[in-house]
Amino acid sequence: MQNHYNLVYREEEREMNPYCLSTGVDLTPWSPLARGILAGSYQGGFSGGSTDRSKGQDRQRTEGLYHGDHVFPIAERVIEIAAKYDKTPAQIAVAWLFHKPGVTSPVVGVSKVAQLEQLVAAVEIQLAEEDLYYLEELYRPVDNLLSIGFS
């Protein structure tokens, strides 16, 4: 099942991931780097875009998908954990996915062979339980119609 799933968007954990696990369907998450946020492309907020892509029209798309006070603090934690393991933030974001049950092959977008090689190497990264908790604890579910009083 190709689902939207990463450290700053984990809504699939509510229903879809458990359903897929119970029926034997593997997960192939798209946007594992949250359009560059988890790779460190927007340090300090959306105005801090560091690449041509994150400064251009992609910024508006990214802001539309990822909003909330938790987004950039989570990204900062990814950067911290990356430094601890001597890895890139992108590797840590993908390694986190490989620690989640059912995830077999995140769908990544790269522009250079070296980026792909780094992300493939993330398969080998073993994150400590306390680091997984540290990465996950700031997440806040996205408001949806049910959570704001519509039914």
Where are these regions (language model features)?
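Beta/alpha (TIM)-barrel catalytic core signal, keyed to glycine-rich beta->alpha loops juxtaposed to Asp/Glu
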Residues: 1-137, 142
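Short coil/turn segments at secondary-structure boundaries
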Residues: 147-151
